[in-house]
Curated annotation (Swiss-Prot):
SUPFAM superfamilies xrefs: Ribulose-phoshate binding barrel
Species assigned in the record: Vibrio campbellii (strain ATCC BAA-1116)
Function of the protein: IGPS catalyzes the conversion of PRFAR and glutamine to IGP, AICAR and glutamate. The HisF subunit catalyzes the cyclization activity that produces IGP and AICAR from PRFAR using the ammonia provided by the HisH subunit.
Signal peptide coordinates: none
Gene name per UniProt: hisF
EC identifiers of the protein: 4.3.2.10
Residue positions of the active site: D11, D130
Broad enzyme group: lyase
Similarity comment: Belongs to the HisA/HisF family.
Reactions catalysed, as given in the entry: 5-[(5-phospho-1-deoxy-D-ribulos-1-ylimino)methylamino]-1-(5-phospho-beta-D-ribosyl)imidazole-4-carboxamide + L-glutamine = D-erythro-1-(imidazol-4-yl)glycerol 3-phosphate + 5-amino-1-(5-phospho-beta-D-ribosyl)imidazole-4-carboxamide + L-glutamate + H(+)
Location of this chain's protein in the cell: Cytoplasm
GO cellular component labels: cytoplasm
Pathway: Amino-acid biosynthesis; L-histidine biosynthesis; L-histidine from 5-phospho-alpha-D-ribose 1-diphosphate: step 5/9
Subcellular location, principal: cytoplasm
Name this protein carries in UniProt: Imidazole glycerol phosphate synthase subunit HisF
Length: 257
């Protein structure tokens, strides 16, 4: 059985790591490179970096910090932010990233997923999906440009349909960002994860809501996700990754120690 992955997520804005709650009111956490080093040393399996305003600003990730991160860590990392073409992706991979993740650009141009998968292989193409539960309609809706509070908006896609669409087009992995849970630390949305898992045949990463070690165990045991991504609990040192892995192992969950 493949080991379950623990993935710290670093939201980057203006060259620094920031963290919001439900995608709003971001505070500065610190510099990118020391945080990346700390997580690698603690035992993270992978890191994800989101340049959260690149898409809404119409630019690509600042590649200088990608190269700096690649120099100091020896675990795989994925970079997202404003990647609109194979050239954009190639540059980020050349600077040392192992995977690229696309979100808003894939919604604007779904063919981009196929182009990137054909050129670089599905294993390094991740699609991020920002999913919002609308209590009034009872539906899970995909949102776009979520890094910018002024520009964020609902798309015409329901989450389950978009999950199926991106797989058809060549997504090698899906990160499901559950917006209602983001930064709230009261657990992953297990119901939503199960709904997506039913139609997701590629690795599925849960994102949004981790607040305690039990929340990670729940996502693995109750929704069979392949990885769990979290930010604030790691940034604020609420949870140590090494201790989390020991806990998961005690719960009978396969992890890399």
């Amino acid at each position: 059985m493949l080991a379950k992955r623990i993935i710290p997520c670093l939201d980057v804005r203006d060259g620094q790591v920031v963290k919001g709650v439900q995608f709003r009111n971001h505070e500065i956490i610190g510099d990118i490179v020391p945080l990346a080093q700390r997580y690698a040393e603690e035992g993270a399996d992978e890191l994800v970096f989101y340049d959260i305003t690149a898409s809404s600003d119409g630019r690509v990730v600042d590649k200088s910090w990608v190269a700096r991160v690649a120099e100091v860590i020896d675990i795989p990392f994925c970079v997202a932010g404003g990647i609109k073409s194979a050239e954009d992706a190639a540059r980020i991979l050349e600077f040392g990233a192992d995977k690229v993740s696309i979100n808003s650009p894939a919604l604007a141009n779904p063919q981009l997923i196929t182009d990137l998968a054909d050129k670089f292989g599905v294993q390094c193409i991740v699609v991020g999906i920002d999913s919002y539960y609308d209590k009034e309609t009872g539906k899970y809706q995909v949102y776009q440009f979520t890094g910018d509070e002024e520009r964020t908006k609902a798309t015409q896609w329901e989450t389950r349909d978009w999950v199926q669409e991106v797989q058809k087009r060549g997504a090698g992995e899906i990160v499901l960002n559950m917006m209602n849970q983001d930064g709230v630390r009261n657990g992953y949305d297990i119901k939503q994860l199960n709904m997506v898992r039913e139609v997701c045949n590629v690795p599925l990463i849960a994102s949004g809501g981790a607040g305690a070690m039990e929340h990670f165990a729940e996502a693995y045991q109750k929704a069979n996700v392949d990885g769990a991504l979290a930010a604030s609990v790691f940034h604020k040192q609420v949870i140590n990754i090494g201790e989390l892995k020991q806990y998961l192992k005690q719960q009978g969950i396969e992890v890399r120690l």
